[in-house]
Protein backbone atom coordinates (compact mmCIF):
# COMPACT_ATOMS: atom_id res chain seq x y z
CA UNK A 1 0.00 0.00 0.00
CA UNK A 2 2.84 2.35 0.82
CA UNK A 3 4.51 1.64 -2.49
CA UNK A 4 1.24 2.26 -4.27
CA UNK A 5 0.77 5.53 -2.38
CA UNK A 6 4.29 6.61 -3.13
CA UNK A 7 3.74 5.93 -6.82
CA UNK A 8 0.64 8.11 -6.90
CA UNK A 9 2.33 10.98 -5.11
CA UNK A 10 5.37 10.78 -7.33
CA UNK A 11 3.51 10.36 -10.60
CA UNK A 12 3.76 14.05 -11.57
CA UNK A 13 7.48 14.11 -10.82
CA UNK A 14 8.00 11.25 -13.25
CA UNK A 15 6.53 13.24 -16.15
CA UNK A 16 8.97 14.81 -18.63
CA UNK A 17 9.85 18.37 -17.72
CA UNK A 18 8.64 19.69 -21.09
CA UNK A 19 5.21 18.17 -20.47
CA UNK A 20 5.01 19.63 -16.96
CA UNK A 21 5.90 23.07 -18.30
CA UNK A 22 3.22 22.73 -20.96
CA UNK A 23 0.62 21.85 -18.32
CA UNK A 24 1.67 24.79 -16.15
CA UNK A 25 1.52 27.16 -19.12
CA UNK A 26 -2.28 26.87 -19.12
CA UNK A 27 -2.58 28.12 -15.52
CA UNK A 28 -2.62 31.70 -14.17
CA UNK A 29 0.80 32.70 -12.89
CA UNK A 30 -0.51 32.86 -9.30
CA UNK A 31 -1.27 29.12 -9.39
CA UNK A 32 1.94 28.32 -11.22
CA UNK A 33 3.98 29.96 -8.46
CA UNK A 34 1.99 28.04 -5.85
CA UNK A 35 3.24 24.74 -7.30
CA UNK A 36 6.73 25.56 -6.02
CA UNK A 37 5.77 24.08 -2.62
CA UNK A 38 5.01 20.64 -4.06
CA UNK A 39 8.59 19.38 -4.05
CA UNK A 40 12.23 20.41 -4.44
CA UNK A 41 12.00 19.63 -8.15
CA UNK A 42 9.10 22.05 -8.54
CA UNK A 43 10.69 24.83 -6.49
CA UNK A 44 12.34 26.39 -9.53
CA UNK A 45 10.36 24.72 -12.29
CA UNK A 46 7.73 27.47 -12.43
CA UNK A 47 10.44 29.98 -13.35
CA UNK A 48 10.82 28.24 -16.73
CA UNK A 49 7.13 28.54 -17.69
CA UNK A 50 7.05 30.72 -20.85
CA UNK A 51 3.61 32.21 -20.15
CA UNK A 52 2.76 34.92 -17.63
CA UNK A 53 -0.78 35.90 -16.67
CA UNK A 54 -1.53 38.54 -14.05
CA UNK A 55 -4.89 39.89 -12.90
CA UNK A 56 -4.86 42.64 -10.27
CA UNK A 57 -8.00 41.15 -8.68
CA UNK A 58 -6.21 37.88 -7.98
CA UNK A 59 -3.32 39.37 -6.07
CA UNK A 60 -4.26 40.53 -2.59
CA UNK A 61 -1.37 40.43 -0.11
CA UNK A 62 -0.67 42.09 3.21
CA UNK A 63 3.04 42.11 2.44
CA UNK A 64 3.29 42.97 -1.27
CA UNK A 65 1.46 45.19 -3.71
CA UNK A 66 0.33 43.88 -7.08
CA UNK A 67 3.15 45.76 -8.79
CA UNK A 68 5.74 44.25 -6.45
CA UNK A 69 4.44 40.73 -7.10
CA UNK A 70 4.62 41.21 -10.86
CA UNK A 71 8.13 42.67 -10.64
CA UNK A 72 9.34 39.74 -8.50
CA UNK A 73 7.87 37.29 -11.01
CA UNK A 74 9.68 38.97 -13.89
CA UNK A 75 12.97 39.02 -11.97
CA UNK A 76 12.62 35.29 -11.22
CA UNK A 77 11.74 34.32 -14.78
CA UNK A 78 14.34 32.09 -16.46
CA UNK A 79 12.50 31.14 -19.67
CA UNK A 80 14.65 32.36 -22.59
CA UNK A 81 11.58 33.10 -24.71
CA UNK A 82 8.35 34.53 -23.30
CA UNK A 83 5.50 33.12 -25.39
CA UNK A 84 2.67 35.16 -23.86
CA UNK A 85 1.98 37.93 -21.39
CA UNK A 86 -1.58 38.61 -20.22
CA UNK A 87 -2.08 41.68 -18.02
CA UNK A 88 -5.49 42.58 -16.56
CA UNK A 89 -5.89 45.74 -14.49
CA UNK A 90 -9.19 46.33 -12.72
CA UNK A 91 -7.59 48.66 -10.18
CA UNK A 92 -5.26 51.61 -10.52
CA UNK A 93 -1.73 50.64 -11.56
CA UNK A 94 1.17 52.96 -12.25
CA UNK A 95 1.46 53.35 -16.07
CA UNK A 96 5.24 53.48 -15.70
CA UNK A 97 5.16 49.97 -14.23
CA UNK A 98 3.02 48.69 -17.10
CA UNK A 99 5.41 50.13 -19.65
CA UNK A 100 8.36 48.62 -17.76
CA UNK A 101 6.81 45.13 -17.69
CA UNK A 102 5.99 45.22 -21.38
CA UNK A 103 9.51 46.43 -22.16
CA UNK A 104 11.01 43.53 -20.18
CA UNK A 105 8.71 41.12 -22.00
CA UNK A 106 9.82 42.49 -25.37
CA UNK A 107 13.42 41.90 -24.32
CA UNK A 108 12.44 38.27 -23.68
CA UNK A 109 11.25 37.92 -27.30
CA UNK A 110 7.54 38.10 -26.45
CA UNK A 111 5.18 36.44 -28.95
CA UNK A 112 1.72 37.38 -27.61
CA UNK A 113 0.57 40.38 -25.54
CA UNK A 114 -2.97 40.71 -24.15
CA UNK A 115 -3.61 43.92 -22.25
CA UNK A 116 -6.93 44.50 -20.45
CA UNK A 117 -7.62 47.72 -18.55
CA UNK A 118 -10.93 48.24 -16.75
CA UNK A 119 -13.13 50.98 -18.31
CA UNK A 120 -12.74 53.28 -15.30
CA UNK A 121 -8.96 53.17 -15.70
CA UNK A 122 -6.94 54.55 -18.61
CA UNK A 123 -3.60 53.46 -19.97
CA UNK A 124 -2.07 55.25 -22.95
CA UNK A 125 -0.47 52.76 -25.29
CA UNK A 126 2.37 54.84 -26.75
CA UNK A 127 4.40 54.39 -29.90
CA UNK A 128 7.41 53.42 -27.79
CA UNK A 129 5.64 50.12 -27.05
CA UNK A 130 5.07 49.42 -30.75
CA UNK A 131 8.60 48.43 -31.60
CA UNK A 132 9.06 44.69 -31.24
CA UNK A 133 10.57 42.24 -33.71
CA UNK A 134 9.03 39.08 -32.24
CA UNK A 135 5.45 40.03 -31.28
CA UNK A 136 2.96 38.00 -33.34
CA UNK A 137 -0.32 38.70 -31.50
CA UNK A 138 -1.48 41.94 -29.85
CA UNK A 139 -4.84 42.33 -28.10
CA UNK A 140 -5.81 45.67 -26.53
CA UNK A 141 -9.05 45.69 -24.53
CA UNK A 142 -11.22 48.49 -23.02
CA UNK A 143 -9.50 51.27 -21.04
CA UNK A 144 -6.60 51.75 -23.43
CA UNK A 145 -5.87 54.95 -25.34
CA UNK A 146 -3.86 54.48 -28.54
CA UNK A 147 -1.54 57.41 -29.25
CA UNK A 148 0.83 56.77 -32.15
CA UNK A 149 1.87 60.05 -33.82
CA UNK A 150 4.19 58.41 -36.36
CA UNK A 151 4.68 54.98 -37.97
CA UNK A 152 6.47 52.36 -35.87
CA UNK A 153 7.43 48.74 -36.56
CA UNK A 154 5.80 45.47 -35.52
CA UNK A 155 7.34 43.42 -38.28
CA UNK A 156 6.18 39.99 -37.01
CA UNK A 157 2.63 40.93 -35.98
CA UNK A 158 0.00 38.74 -37.66
CA UNK A 159 -3.02 39.16 -35.34
CA UNK A 160 -4.34 42.45 -33.91
CA UNK A 161 -7.45 42.88 -31.73
CA UNK A 162 -8.67 46.39 -30.90
CA UNK A 163 -11.53 45.86 -28.47
CA UNK A 164 -13.40 49.01 -27.34
CA UNK A 165 -10.25 51.10 -27.11
CA UNK A 166 -9.98 54.83 -27.78
CA UNK A 167 -7.68 56.67 -30.16
CA UNK A 168 -6.05 60.06 -30.00
CA UNK A 169 -6.95 60.66 -33.65
CA UNK A 170 -7.41 58.99 -37.02
CA UNK A 171 -3.69 59.27 -37.71
CA UNK A 172 -2.96 56.99 -34.75
CA UNK A 173 -5.04 54.24 -36.39
CA UNK A 174 -3.30 54.63 -39.74
CA UNK A 175 0.14 54.67 -38.12
CA UNK A 176 -0.59 51.54 -36.10
CA UNK A 177 -1.87 49.54 -39.06
CA UNK A 178 0.85 50.73 -41.43
CA UNK A 179 3.42 49.48 -38.93
CA UNK A 180 2.32 45.86 -39.38
CA UNK A 181 3.70 44.73 -42.78
CA UNK A 182 2.52 41.09 -42.50
CA UNK A 183 -0.73 41.56 -40.54
CA UNK A 184 -3.25 38.86 -41.50
CA UNK A 185 -6.04 39.01 -38.88
CA UNK A 186 -7.70 42.19 -37.60
CA UNK A 187 -10.62 42.50 -35.17
CA UNK A 188 -12.14 45.92 -34.42
CA UNK A 189 -14.79 45.88 -31.70
CA UNK A 190 -16.32 49.32 -31.20
CA UNK A 191 -14.12 52.37 -30.90
CA UNK A 192 -14.31 55.62 -29.00
CA UNK A 193 -13.77 59.32 -29.51
CA UNK A 194 -11.99 61.51 -32.04
CA UNK A 195 -12.50 59.16 -34.98
CA UNK A 196 -15.00 59.57 -37.82
CA UNK A 197 -13.06 57.88 -40.61
CA UNK A 198 -11.64 54.49 -39.69
CA UNK A 199 -9.20 53.68 -42.50
CA UNK A 200 -8.01 50.10 -42.90
CA UNK A 201 -5.40 49.83 -45.63
CA UNK A 202 -3.45 46.63 -45.07
CA UNK A 203 -2.17 44.85 -48.21
CA UNK A 204 -1.45 41.59 -46.33
CA UNK A 205 -4.76 41.32 -44.44
CA UNK A 206 -6.69 38.06 -44.97
CA UNK A 207 -9.35 38.15 -42.26
CA UNK A 208 -11.28 41.17 -40.93
CA UNK A 209 -14.01 41.37 -38.29
CA UNK A 210 -15.76 44.61 -37.34
CA UNK A 211 -18.38 44.87 -34.60
CA UNK A 212 -20.00 48.25 -33.94
CA UNK A 213 -23.34 47.70 -32.21
CA UNK A 214 -23.65 50.72 -29.91
CA UNK A 215 -25.51 52.71 -32.59
CA UNK A 216 -24.21 56.10 -31.56
CA UNK A 217 -25.65 59.14 -33.26
CA UNK A 218 -22.48 60.45 -34.84
CA UNK A 219 -21.68 59.45 -38.41
CA UNK A 220 -18.87 57.01 -39.03
CA UNK A 221 -17.14 55.74 -42.13
CA UNK A 222 -15.07 52.61 -42.60
CA UNK A 223 -12.77 52.77 -45.63
CA UNK A 224 -11.31 49.33 -46.23
CA UNK A 225 -8.64 48.69 -48.86
CA UNK A 226 -7.56 45.07 -48.47
CA UNK A 227 -6.55 43.43 -51.77
CA UNK A 228 -5.80 40.00 -50.20
CA UNK A 229 -8.82 39.74 -47.88
CA UNK A 230 -10.58 36.35 -47.90
CA UNK A 231 -12.97 36.59 -44.92
CA UNK A 232 -15.08 39.56 -43.81
CA UNK A 233 -17.55 39.75 -40.93
CA UNK A 234 -19.33 42.98 -40.02
CA UNK A 235 -21.85 43.31 -37.20
CA UNK A 236 -24.04 46.22 -36.22
CA UNK A 237 -23.56 48.93 -38.86
CA UNK A 238 -26.63 51.16 -38.97
CA UNK A 239 -27.90 53.90 -41.25
CA UNK A 240 -25.38 56.40 -39.90
CA UNK A 241 -22.46 54.30 -41.10
CA UNK A 242 -20.85 54.21 -44.51
CA UNK A 243 -18.72 51.35 -45.71
CA UNK A 244 -16.28 51.61 -48.64
CA UNK A 245 -14.69 48.28 -49.47
CA UNK A 246 -12.04 47.17 -51.93
CA UNK A 247 -11.49 43.43 -51.50
CA UNK A 248 -11.20 41.77 -54.93
CA UNK A 249 -10.17 38.38 -53.47
CA UNK A 250 -13.06 38.14 -50.97
CA UNK A 251 -14.38 34.59 -50.49
CA UNK A 252 -16.70 34.83 -47.45
CA UNK A 253 -18.70 37.85 -46.25
CA UNK A 254 -21.14 38.02 -43.33
CA UNK A 255 -23.17 41.08 -42.28
CA UNK A 256 -25.36 40.98 -39.17
CA UNK A 257 -27.48 43.27 -36.97
CA UNK A 258 -27.69 46.41 -39.03
CA UNK A 259 -28.32 48.00 -42.39
CA UNK A 260 -26.02 48.05 -45.36
CA UNK A 261 -25.11 50.68 -47.94
CA UNK A 262 -23.79 49.11 -51.15
CA UNK A 263 -21.80 51.83 -52.94
CA UNK A 264 -20.14 51.50 -56.35
CA UNK A 265 -16.77 50.65 -54.83
CA UNK A 266 -18.43 47.89 -52.82
CA UNK A 267 -20.13 46.01 -55.64
CA UNK A 268 -17.16 44.24 -57.20
CA UNK A 269 -15.90 42.99 -53.83
CA UNK A 270 -19.20 41.39 -52.88
CA UNK A 271 -19.67 39.97 -56.35
CA UNK A 272 -16.46 37.96 -55.95
CA UNK A 273 -17.60 36.38 -52.67
CA UNK A 274 -18.45 32.69 -52.88
CA UNK A 275 -20.32 32.66 -49.55
CA UNK A 276 -22.44 35.63 -48.53
CA UNK A 277 -24.72 35.88 -45.48
CA UNK A 278 -26.60 39.09 -44.65
CA UNK A 279 -28.59 39.32 -41.43
CA UNK A 280 -29.77 42.85 -42.23
CA UNK A 281 -33.09 44.70 -42.24
CA UNK A 282 -32.25 47.50 -44.69
CA UNK A 283 -30.23 47.54 -47.89
CA UNK A 284 -29.26 50.62 -49.90
CA UNK A 285 -27.59 49.82 -53.20
CA UNK A 286 -26.14 51.99 -55.97
CA UNK A 287 -27.15 51.05 -59.52
CA UNK A 288 -24.34 52.50 -61.59
CA UNK A 289 -21.85 49.65 -61.78
CA UNK A 290 -21.88 47.09 -64.58
CA UNK A 291 -24.42 44.28 -64.08
CA UNK A 292 -25.52 45.61 -60.69
CA UNK A 293 -28.80 43.70 -60.98
CA UNK A 294 -27.01 40.34 -60.86
CA UNK A 295 -25.47 41.35 -57.55
CA UNK A 296 -28.91 42.49 -56.38
CA UNK A 297 -30.16 38.95 -56.94
CA UNK A 298 -27.34 37.63 -54.74
CA UNK A 299 -28.07 40.24 -52.07
CA UNK A 300 -31.78 39.38 -51.96
CA UNK A 301 -31.05 35.66 -51.76
CA UNK A 302 -28.59 36.30 -48.91
CA UNK A 303 -30.86 38.66 -46.89
CA UNK A 304 -33.86 36.62 -45.69
CA UNK A 305 -34.95 39.26 -43.13
CA UNK A 306 -34.72 42.31 -45.42
CA UNK A 307 -37.53 44.83 -44.81
CA UNK A 308 -36.32 47.93 -46.69
CA UNK A 309 -34.76 48.00 -50.16
CA UNK A 310 -33.48 51.25 -51.64
CA UNK A 311 -31.92 51.48 -55.11
CA UNK A 312 -30.12 54.70 -56.07
CA UNK A 313 -28.61 55.86 -59.35
CA UNK A 314 -26.15 58.73 -58.79
CA UNK A 315 -25.32 59.13 -62.48
CA UNK A 316 -28.27 61.42 -63.28
CA UNK A 317 -27.80 62.51 -66.91
CA UNK A 318 -24.92 60.14 -67.68
CA UNK A 319 -25.94 57.44 -70.15
CA UNK A 320 -25.60 53.84 -69.02
CA UNK A 321 -25.86 52.37 -72.51
CA UNK A 322 -22.18 51.46 -72.56
CA UNK A 323 -22.10 50.18 -69.00
CA UNK A 324 -24.20 47.05 -69.26
CA UNK A 325 -22.82 43.87 -70.80
CA UNK A 326 -25.29 41.21 -69.65
CA UNK A 327 -29.04 40.92 -69.38
CA UNK A 328 -30.73 40.29 -66.07
CA UNK A 329 -31.87 36.76 -65.28
CA UNK A 330 -34.65 36.22 -62.76
CA UNK A 331 -33.77 34.13 -59.69
CA UNK A 332 -34.66 30.45 -59.97
CA UNK A 333 -36.57 30.75 -56.70
CA UNK A 334 -38.24 33.80 -55.19
CA UNK A 335 -35.99 35.13 -52.37
CA UNK A 336 -37.36 34.61 -48.87
CA UNK A 337 -37.28 38.33 -48.08
CA UNK A 338 -39.77 39.02 -50.90
CA UNK A 339 -42.08 36.28 -49.72
CA UNK A 340 -42.20 37.21 -46.05
CA UNK A 341 -40.47 40.46 -45.00
CA UNK A 342 -39.95 43.25 -47.55
CA UNK A 343 -42.25 46.18 -46.71
CA UNK A 344 -40.62 49.22 -48.33
CA UNK A 345 -39.18 49.54 -51.84
CA UNK A 346 -37.62 52.81 -53.05
CA UNK A 347 -35.95 53.43 -56.41
CA UNK A 348 -34.34 56.83 -56.90
CA UNK A 349 -33.68 57.87 -60.54
CA UNK A 350 -35.23 54.76 -62.00
CA UNK A 351 -34.21 54.56 -65.67
CA UNK A 352 -37.54 53.88 -67.36
CA UNK A 353 -35.82 53.55 -70.75
CA UNK A 354 -33.80 50.49 -69.75
CA UNK A 355 -35.56 47.16 -70.20
CA UNK A 356 -33.43 45.51 -67.48
CA UNK A 357 -34.50 48.04 -64.85
CA UNK A 358 -38.12 47.57 -65.84
CA UNK A 359 -37.70 43.82 -65.40
CA UNK A 360 -36.19 44.23 -61.93
CA UNK A 361 -38.95 46.60 -60.76
CA UNK A 362 -41.67 44.35 -62.19
CA UNK A 363 -40.20 41.27 -60.52
CA UNK A 364 -40.12 42.91 -57.09
CA UNK A 365 -43.70 44.19 -57.38
CA UNK A 366 -44.97 40.80 -58.54
CA UNK A 367 -43.30 38.83 -55.76
CA UNK A 368 -43.09 41.07 -52.66
CA UNK A 369 -46.08 39.71 -50.74
CA UNK A 370 -45.79 42.04 -47.73
CA UNK A 371 -44.89 45.22 -49.59
CA UNK A 372 -46.66 48.24 -48.11
CA UNK A 373 -45.18 51.07 -50.14
CA UNK A 374 -43.19 51.43 -53.33
CA UNK A 375 -41.72 54.78 -54.37
CA UNK A 376 -40.16 55.23 -57.81
CA UNK A 377 -38.61 58.50 -58.95
CA UNK A 378 -37.14 59.38 -62.35
CA UNK A 379 -34.80 62.02 -63.73
CA UNK A 380 -36.45 65.29 -64.83
CA UNK A 381 -37.48 65.83 -68.45
CA UNK A 382 -37.76 69.28 -69.99
CA UNK A 383 -41.36 70.29 -70.52
CA UNK A 384 -40.72 71.06 -74.20
CA UNK A 385 -39.70 67.45 -74.87
CA UNK A 386 -43.28 66.27 -75.26
CA UNK A 387 -42.40 63.03 -77.02
CA UNK A 388 -40.16 61.85 -74.21
CA UNK A 389 -42.69 62.88 -71.59
CA UNK A 390 -45.30 60.74 -73.33
CA UNK A 391 -42.93 57.77 -73.55
CA UNK A 392 -42.22 57.99 -69.84
CA UNK A 393 -45.91 58.21 -69.03
CA UNK A 394 -46.62 55.02 -71.01
CA UNK A 395 -43.75 53.11 -69.41
CA UNK A 396 -44.75 54.11 -65.90
CA UNK A 397 -48.37 53.23 -66.62
CA UNK A 398 -47.20 49.77 -67.64
CA UNK A 399 -45.33 49.45 -64.37
CA UNK A 400 -48.33 50.72 -62.44
CA UNK A 401 -50.53 48.08 -64.07
CA UNK A 402 -48.34 45.18 -62.91
CA UNK A 403 -50.32 42.73 -60.80
CA UNK A 404 -48.75 43.07 -57.35
CA UNK A 405 -48.31 40.25 -54.88
CA UNK A 406 -49.38 42.59 -52.08
CA UNK A 407 -52.92 43.94 -52.27
CA UNK A 408 -52.07 46.64 -49.73
CA UNK A 409 -49.09 48.02 -51.68
CA UNK A 410 -49.26 51.75 -52.40
CA UNK A 411 -47.13 52.56 -55.46
CA UNK A 412 -46.05 56.21 -55.82
CA UNK A 413 -44.25 57.84 -58.77
CA UNK A 414 -42.17 60.97 -58.21
CA UNK A 415 -40.52 63.24 -60.78
CA UNK A 416 -37.43 65.28 -59.87
Curated annotation (Swiss-Prot):
Residues 9-62 form the F-box domain. Residues 327-378 form the FBD domain. Coiled coil: none annotated. Pfam families: F-box, FBD, LRR_At5g56370. PROSITE patterns: FBOX (PS50181). It comes from the Eukaryota. PANTHER family: EMB|CAB62440.1-RELATED, F-BOX/RNI SUPERFAMILY PROTEIN-RELATED. This is FBD-associated F-box protein At3g52670.
Amino acid sequence: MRNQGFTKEDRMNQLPEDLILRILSFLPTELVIATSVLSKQWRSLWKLVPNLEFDSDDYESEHYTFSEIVCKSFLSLKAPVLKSLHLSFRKSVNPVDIGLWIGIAFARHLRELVLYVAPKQTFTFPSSLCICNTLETLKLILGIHVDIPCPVLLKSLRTLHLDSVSYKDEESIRNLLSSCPILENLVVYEYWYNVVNFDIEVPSLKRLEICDVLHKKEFRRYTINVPCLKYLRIEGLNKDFELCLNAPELVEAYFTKGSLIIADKFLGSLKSAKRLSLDILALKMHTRREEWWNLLTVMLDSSPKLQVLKLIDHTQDVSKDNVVSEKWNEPKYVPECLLSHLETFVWIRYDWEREEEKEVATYILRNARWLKKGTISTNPIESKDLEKLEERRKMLNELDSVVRASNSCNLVFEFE
